[in-house]
Structure formats: C-alpha cells, structure tokens
C-alpha cells in the first residue's frame, strides 16, 4: 500500500515541497532565511488578525484604539509589539535573503528572482501602510510626504495623489483604505510566496559553490527541517528579547503623539528599513528625479541577471567581487544612517556620494570586475 504522504492529492504537494524535496548537501545557514521569512509572514498575519479585532480605522479613534489594545486587551501590548518588531525582523531577513542571492548568484534563476523582487515591493507597500495605521504624528506626516511623491508624475500626478487620498489631504478616507489594503496584501503576498516556491522547485536550490548539485542531493527532511527549527528558535529569542526589553527601540517617539495636521514634526522620516531608499530620494534636489532614483534603487535588483558577466555563478571564489559586495553592504549602511539624519551639511554631501556609489557599484564596478576576473583566470 502506498504511503498517504505520497498518494494523497494535497499532502503529496506538501511532501514534494518540504519532506522528500531533494536539496543540495552543502547549503549553509544563509539558506535558512527563506523559511524564517515564511515564519515571519505567518506571525505577522496572526498577530495582525488579533490586532484588527480591536483596531478602529477612523481618524478620531485610531490612536486611542491602539492605546486601548496596549492597556486593556489581554496581552494586547505583546501582540502589538510582536507585530511592530516582527516587521523589523521581516525586513532584516529580507535584506539578508537578497544579499545571499546576490553573493551566491541565485539571481540566475530569473523567474524566482523576479517574483522575489515583486514580493519585496509588496512587503514594502504593506509595511508603509501599516505604519500609517496607529495615526501618530509620524504616521500622518509619513503618509503625507510619501504619497505626495506621486504628484511628481507628469500630467496625471496631482490627480493620482488626490485619488489615493480620497480627498484633498490625508484624512479619514485615506486611513480606511490603507487599513483595507494593509489587511488584504499579506494574503496576496502568501500567494506570491507559493509562486516563488513553485519557480524555485522547478530548478532546485542553488548552493555556496554555485555548481550544479544534482549528483549530490539529500532529502529536505530531517536534515534541513531540523536546521530550520534551530533558525526559528534563534529568531524567536531575538524577537522576544526585543519585544520584552526594548519594544520601542526601532520606533519613533513622535508616533506617541496623536496626528496633528497643523503641526509638522521637525524631522519626518520613515521606519529604519526604508531609510536607505529615503536617503537616495533626498539626495537628488529635483522632485521627479528623486522619485525615479527611489524607484530604481529597488528595481535595480531586476538587472542583476542581465549584468552578470562572470563565468562563475557564485562569488565564493572571486575575492575582488567579494570586496565590492561588502563595499555595497557598507554603502547601504551609510545610506541608512544618512536617511535618519536632518537635511544639513555634511549629511547632504555624504548622502549624495553614497547614492552615486550605490548605483555605480551595481551598474559598472561589479560587472567590470567580474569581466576582469574572467581575464585573470584566462577564461
């Protein structure tokens, strides 16, 4: 008699994806982030669902409903801070996952990679709208500033902004629709994750050497399930330490002041995970130019498969490319720091230099260095 796991129409799909899946024998801890992101998504949907039970998407009561969740709902403070800090964990893992993909050349799986870029955009949109919901000062002004960027689009811009706002400023209509989108998007993200995995399982996983591993596969379970559980354990320890000891470490104090359209905060800035893109946006004095640079700073990821000029897939055996990779990481950290600083000297100049270096490294330095390495290896 056939094993149910292998014959049942539904369980069979799970089996081929998580149990009997042939996986390379040498994938390192850098391959743990996929499962960690899945756990993060599940956690966000679950905590978000419980928050939505008590939250009211109305300008007059939104702020007090969040206060009510923290003060009066059983473990409401825990749910709220797990959701807020869970988003930070989500982005840490996202960036590490993308960094791994760049370092080991996983972007050569073009379909998987492009769906991944779309996933990143969807998660960024969801996080932005979620930040607006508590209706604090930074929520309101962040929403005003970021949505206003669309007015830079020629001809249709101003109309588009008013259409998104549902009026002539960020108000009740904006908050209500942002809540609706913030609720539905994670489920769309879940569907996209399934497509992401579908494309990945068409080719199989990459590995640190960047060489085809068909001749050396091991079953996903128990080897990588136990490895994933260890990763999840580390993640939960980190997340719960953050939630229990310093829940507001990554937040902005301004968001504990209720939204006031008549009073602008001295420094409007998004959550830390958007600061690098915000720094790129601010480094260009022209509005449309800034918006284009902002969009391209994310969409540039789609160019990696085209820009790959090395005869080797992975950077494991390419020391010069490794140096550039870490230069890019340092550059992004500088951009993140600059994004949180006021618009004044010397931060403006540092931001502009870091923005130019970001695009220059990806578009010119990395492909040309890869070609040089080919020459050095006489390929």
Curated annotation (Swiss-Prot):
Membrane-crossing segments per the record: 33-53, 77-98, 113-133, 178-198, 226-246, 288-308, 320-340, 347-367
Subcellular location: Mitochondrion inner membrane
Superkingdom, taxonomy of origin: Eukaryota
Binding positions for heme b b562 per the UniProt entry: 83, 182
Cofactor(s) required, per the database record: heme b
One Gene Ontology term, aspect cellular component: mitochondrial inner membrane
Signal peptide: none
Binding site for a ubiquinone: 201
Example of a GO biological process term: mitochondrial electron transport, ubiquinol to cytochrome c
InterPro entries given in the database record: Cyt_b/b6_C, Cyt_b/b6_C_sf, Cyt_b/b6_N, Cytb/b6-like_sf, Cytochrome_b, Cytochrome_b_C_euk/bac, Cytochrome_b_N_euk/bac, Di-haem_cyt_TM
UniProt binding sites for heme b b566: 97, 196
GO-annotated molecular function: metal ion binding; ubiquinol-cytochrome-c reductase activity
CDD domains reported for this sequence: cytochrome_b_C, Cytochrome_b_N
Family: Belongs to the cytochrome b family.
Note in the entry: Heme 1 (or BL or b562) is low-potential and absorbs at about 562 nm, and heme 2 (or BH or b566) is high-potential and absorbs at about 566 nm.
Chain's role: Component of the ubiquinol-cytochrome c reductase complex (complex III or cytochrome b-c1 complex) that is part of the mitochondrial respiratory chain. The b-c1 complex mediates electron transfer from ubiquinol to cytochrome c. Contributes to the generation of a proton gradient across the mitochondrial membrane that is then used for ATP synthesis.
Subunit structure and binding partners: The cytochrome bc1 complex contains 11 subunits: 3 respiratory subunits (MT-CYB, CYC1 and UQCRFS1), 2 core proteins (UQCRC1 and UQCRC2) and 6 low-molecular weight proteins (UQCRH/QCR6, UQCRB/QCR7, UQCRQ/QCR8, UQCR10/QCR9, UQCR11/QCR10 and a cleavage product of UQCRFS1). This cytochrome bc1 complex then forms a dimer.
Name of the protein in question: Cytochrome b
């Amino acid at each position: 008699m056939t094993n149910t796991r292998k014959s049942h129409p539904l369980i069979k799909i799970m089996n081929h994806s998580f149990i009997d899946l042939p996986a390379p024998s040498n994938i390192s801890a850098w391959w743990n982030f996929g499962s960690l992101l899945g756990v993060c998504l599940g956690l966000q949907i679950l905590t978000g669902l419980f928050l939505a039970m008590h939250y009211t998407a109305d300008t007059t009561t939104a702020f007090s409903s969040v206060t009510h969740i923290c003060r009066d709902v059983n473990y409401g403070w825990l749910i709220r801070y797990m959701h807020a800090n869970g988003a930070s964990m989500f982005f840490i893992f996202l960036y590490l996952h993308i960094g791994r993909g760049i370092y080991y050349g996983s972007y050569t799986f073009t379909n998987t990679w492009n769906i991944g870029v779309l996933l990143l955009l969807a998660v960024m949109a969801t996080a932005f709208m979620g930040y607006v919901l508590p209706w604090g000062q930074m929520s309101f002004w962040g929403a005003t500033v970021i949505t206003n960027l669309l007015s830079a689009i020629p001809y249709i811009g101003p109309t588009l902004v008013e259409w998104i706002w549902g009026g002539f400023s960020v108000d009740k209509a904006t908050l209500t629709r942002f809540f609706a989108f913030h609720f539905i998007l994670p489920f769309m993200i879940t569907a996209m994750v399934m497509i992401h995995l579908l494309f990945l399982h068409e080719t199989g996983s990459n590995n640190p050497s960047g060489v085809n591993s068909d001749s050396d596969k091991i079953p996903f379970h128990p080897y990588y399930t136990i490895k994933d559980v260890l990763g999840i354990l580390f993640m939960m320890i980190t997340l719960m330490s953050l939630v229990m000891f310093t829940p507001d470490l990554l937040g902005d104090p301004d968001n504990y002041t209720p939204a006031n359209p008549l009073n602008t905060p001295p420094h409007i800035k998004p959550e830390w995970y958007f600061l690098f893109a915000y720094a790129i946006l601010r480094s260009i004095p022209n509005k449309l130019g800034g918006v284009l640079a902002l969009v391209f700073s994310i969409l540039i990821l789609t160019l990696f498969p085209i820009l790959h000029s090395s005869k080797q897939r992975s950077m494991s055996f390419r020391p010069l490319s490794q140096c550039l990779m870490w230069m890019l990481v340092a550059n992004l950290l500088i951009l993140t720091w600059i994004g949180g600083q006021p618009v004044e000297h010397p931060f403006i100049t540092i931001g502009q230099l870091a923005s130019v270096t970001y695009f220059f490294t990806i578009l010119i330095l990395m492909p040309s260095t890869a070609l040089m390495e080919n020459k050095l290896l006489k390929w």
